[in-house]
A protein has these predicted regions:
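Walker A/P-loop nucleotide-binding motif
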Residues: 3-19
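Short, flexible micro-motifs
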Residues: 13-18, 27, 77, 142
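Residue-level preference for the first positions of well-ordered beta-strands
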Residues: 5-7, 33, 67
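Post-Walker A helix-loop "phosphate-sensing" segment adjacent to the P-loop in P-loop NTPases
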Residues: 25-37
Length: 165
């Protein structure tokens, strides 16, 4: 029931989408509505709604869903009007509904997803990062060919403990 964003980053194949889907399944089990879409699919649906005069209705529909999972943010650079659409959606959901975002980009690179508008990038990313749970996954790709008994392993980055010897 918490509305804080969950941001999951890491290289390709480390389980970001899988983890996001697991969060979605947990929400569904608790009776919540969930929408899972790639960033490109989400923005294409908003663009299609604009073309038939239903942009505001579609935006509000996505803004109200209790959990929105946006997969592969930053995979492609956002150009107008997609950059504005994503900002509008994030602004509508800000502190109102839970959003999970996955990305291959490191958190420090998220503004690069908005190459044409640094101010819009800053405003959007700032809303996403505010009170967010930030997870960084690392490891070999689960999709890579496997040799022998070794399995690809993903680790969650953590701060090393201080050893007081």
């Amino acid at each position: 029931d918490e509305r804080a964003p969950v941001l999951i980053v890491g290289p390709c194949g480390t389980g970001k989408s899988h983890l996001a889907q697991a969060l979605g399944h947990c929400a569904v089990r608790q009776g919540q509505d969930v929408v899972f879409a790639s960033c490109a699919q989400l923005l294409a649906s908003l663009n299609a709604a604009r073309a038939i005069g239903n942009y505001e209705r579609k935006l509000q529909q996505l803004a109200r869903v209790p959990l929105l999972i946006i997969d592969d943010f930053g995979l492609k650079p956002l150009r107008a009007p997609a950059d504005e659409d994503l900002h509008d959606l994030i602004a509508e959901r800000y502190e109102q509904a839970a959003t999970v975002v996955t990305s291959n980009l490191d958190f420090t690179e998220w503004d690069q997803a908005f190459p044409g508008n640094r101010l819009l990038a800053s405003a959007t990313v700032d809303r996403l990062r505010h009170n967010a749970y930030c997870l960084t996954l690392d490891g070999a790709s689960y999709r890579a060919p496997r040799q022998g008994p070794n399995k690809a392993k993903t680790t969650l980055a953590s701060t090393p403990k201080n050893n007081h010897s």
